[in-house]
Each structure stands twice: as structure tokens, then as C-alpha cells.
Amino acid sequence: LPICPSGSVNCQVSLGELFDRAVKLSHYIHFLSSEMFNEFDERYAQGRGFITKAVNGCHNASLTTPEDKEQAQQIHHEDLLNLVLGVLRSWNDPLLHLVTEVQRIKEAPDTILWKAVEIEEQNKRLLEGMEKIIGRVQPGDTGNEVYSRWSGLPSLQLADEDSRLFAFYNLLHCGRRDSHKIDNYLKLLKCRLIHDSNC
């Protein structure tokens, strides 16, 4: 169900409805990201010590994101909206390549591949929805173009299996983390902008 048909001039979906859809989508993406990470972790990461190496190794670490609800509440809604947009945009390339490269993992289960495809598609939808929300909240502003470029493709193609699996592990770990943050930020923004912070 598209948020508004592309090119439609008189899209009458309310801001509240746009936020409802964005929150549902972000929740779904986080659910899928968590499931995919857990499945990969159980199948490929056991006994390899990946978790100790994965700390702070995300490609968009340069985007300063609030760590908790209290920090997020200190940020102006326009900045928080742009931050969500930046994080979503920073995932376009990694998700696209994840779909391709995950097929090359030895005995990769179909469930992991399906989730990678689904997350990539839903991330695009959420990005479109966020651009519409920003267009309503800040008319004329399409959000800043500040987002982190990803340069991790070579690490997903390494010949050394351990190194390659760690690159996947790290990417999925970061995806789960970021999808959780986006889910929380959108709930906070919806509360602030739609319910006047009464939630």
C-alpha cells in the first residue's frame, strides 16, 4: 500500500496517518532485522568471538545519534527528522549489496535471504514516507544530504570465510541497532508532533 501514488498532487493523507504508517513500517523492519541477526548469529557466529569485535564498528558511526529517550527528547524535531532520514539513506547501499552477497554464503537459509530482500524493500518505502513527512513538517525542505557512505562491499566478498562472516555479522548487528533507534525516534516524533507530547 503506497503512502501516496507517485506524482499525485492532491495527496490527502493526514500527517498522523503518515506517522502511523511510518511507525508500523519501522517496527516491522526492526523485527525483521532482529530475526535475521539472531538467525545468522546462531548459524554462523557461534564460538567465533564476533560480538567482542563488533563494538562501534558501524559504517554510519559518524552520524551522532542520541543513545536513549532522554537524549532524543533534547533534540529539536526538525533535527531528529533529518537524522532519521540520514540513517535511512545510509542503509540504501549496504542493504542492496546484502541481498546480492548473502546468496553467496555457504548454505545460507532462504529465510535469511527473504528477510534481506524484505528489509531492503521496506527501507525504501520508509524512506519515501519520511520524505513525505518532512515535506509536510518543513515545506520546501527535502532533508539534508548528510549521511554516511558505505564502503563495506569488499569485506562481504573476502576469500577468508571467517573475515567475510564477521563482515556480515557486523553489518547485521548494525542494522538491528539502527532499526531499533529509528523505531524509537519515530515513536517519539509521532508523540511530539501528532499528540503534542501527551503520550
Curated annotation (Swiss-Prot):
GO CC annotations on file: extracellular space
Compartment annotation: Secreted
Record's comment on post-translational modification: Glycosylated.
Predominant subcellular localization, coarse grouping: secreted
Superkingdom of this protein's organism: Eukaryota
InterPro entries with a match to the protein in the record: 4_helix_cytokine-like_core, Somatotropin/Prolactin, Somatotropin_CS
GO biological process: positive regulation of cell population proliferation; positive regulation of receptor signaling pathway via JAK-STAT; response to nutrient levels
Residues annotated as glycosylated: N60
Disulfide bridges in this chain: C4-C11, C58-C174, C191-C199
UniProt cross-references to PANTHER family, sorted A to Z: PROLACTIN, SOMATOTROPIN,PROLACTIN
Family: Belongs to the somatotropin/prolactin family.
Name the record gives this protein: Prolactin-1
Organism: Crocodylus novaeguineae
